[in-house]
Amino acid sequence: MLTSPQPRADGRLADVMRPLQITWDPMGFALSSLIIRTGRTSVLCSVCVEEGVPRWRKGQGKGWLSAEYRLLPGSTPQRQNRELLKLSGRTQEIQRLIGRSLRAVIDMAALGETTLRIDCDVIQADAGTRTASITGAWIALKRGCDRLLEQGLLTHQPVIEQVAAVSVGLVESYPLLDLDYSEDSRADVDLNVVMGSNGHLLELQGTAEGAPFSRNQLNDLLNLAEPGLQHLQAFQRSALMQED
């Protein structure tokens, strides 16, 4: 693996994550909520619970989880218009990714016929908003389910595994972990990696923005992502312990 000889603009080495921070429960009426900060990217993640499930799910004794994702108007240098009647393709893609990633680690039977709704609202975008959304939403989801257990509304913990996500990319041929916007905008390859706590991959989203990339370069990026994901999952566990 090529290693960049120069520190990055923010002083990090190639394999170092941006600083992580959690602010708990900024929304008093949600089942659970938090703001996750990774560098200058900030995402508000909240969980709400609803009785019942979608029509196609009724009568199966299983729950459901859905996710929504939005960029708030002031989250980028140029104001983002609110998506009201029609969602952009990017927004639809990201919220489906968040939903798939979280449903993969939920025992729907343990929810009964209950729906959990995840909302991820980007307060400030400096790249990595979808990966921060997944990582933060899992923390909020786990705490929300803990609260349902404490209230006697669930009998079993439905969250069966952790899930976290991180971006890696090739910038001037060098693999970098957890790209910020200045790096993401110059990347020849951008890869989002979603991983469970058992080390299994849940999803890969990779794009050659410039030249095609080789299998060896893909392996280099995955090898860079894995310890970053393990770091994120350790952070998730620590955040839950601190909140308790």
From Swiss-Prot:
SUPFAM superfamilies listed in its UniProt record: Ribonuclease PH domain 2-like, Ribosomal protein S5 domain 2-like
Catalytic activity field: tRNA(n+1) + phosphate = tRNA(n) + a ribonucleoside 5'-diphosphate
One annotated GO biological process: rRNA catabolic process
Annotated EC: 2.7.7.56
Disulphide bridges: none
GO MF entries: 3'-5'-RNA exonuclease activity; tRNA binding; tRNA nucleotidyltransferase activity
Highest taxon in the source lineage: Bacteria
Keyword RNA-binding: yes
Keywords for this protein: Nucleotidyltransferase, RNA-binding, rRNA processing, Transferase, tRNA processing, tRNA-binding
Entry function: Phosphorolytic 3'-5' exoribonuclease that plays an important role in tRNA 3'-end maturation. Removes nucleotide residues following the 3'-CCA terminus of tRNAs; can also add nucleotides to the ends of RNA molecules by using nucleoside diphosphates as substrates, but this may not be physiologically important. Probably plays a role in initiation of 16S rRNA degradation (leading to ribosome degradation) during starvation.
Subunit structure and binding partners: Homohexameric ring arranged as a trimer of dimers.
Protein name (database record): Ribonuclease PH
Species of origin: Prochlorococcus marinus (strain MIT 9313)
Top-level taxonomy: Bacteria, Bacillati, Cyanobacteriota, Cyanophyceae, Synechococcales
